[in-house]
Amino acid sequence: MEYLKIFSEVKSRSINSKQKGKKGELELVRKLKEYGYNCRRTNQFCGNTGQADDVIGLDYIHIECKRVEKLNIDEAIEQAKRDSKDDKFPTVFHRKNRKDWLVTMPLDSWIKLYNEYYSSMKLAERENADESK
């Protein structure tokens, strides 16, 4: 009898955890849509998408979404690295109550993104300089 009670509590926590995860993912989707990105939550538990991302819609970015008060960021980053495809940057989008969303990613991925940003800014500067001649 005690076993059934413990099993029921564990199952309840598991379902509650999935519901909280879904809620956080939907919240992140709404936030990304505010920025103009057509993002959506994946059905990662159905097994029919073939995707491990929690949220899709940002090309080349693997999104691991965590909406928790206490986050083990090292474990979350390792999960993102493990689940991301070779052509995607592993990222963890995370938020606590009454705080802004944050994005954490490995430094080498950030450097690659920054190099692309820097190159595009320099190209725009050259184009603007050429137009003003």
Kindly give the residue locations of the regions a language model identified:
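Catalytic phosphate/metal-binding cores of nucleic-acid and nucleotide-processing enzymes, i.e., regions
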Residues: 1-133
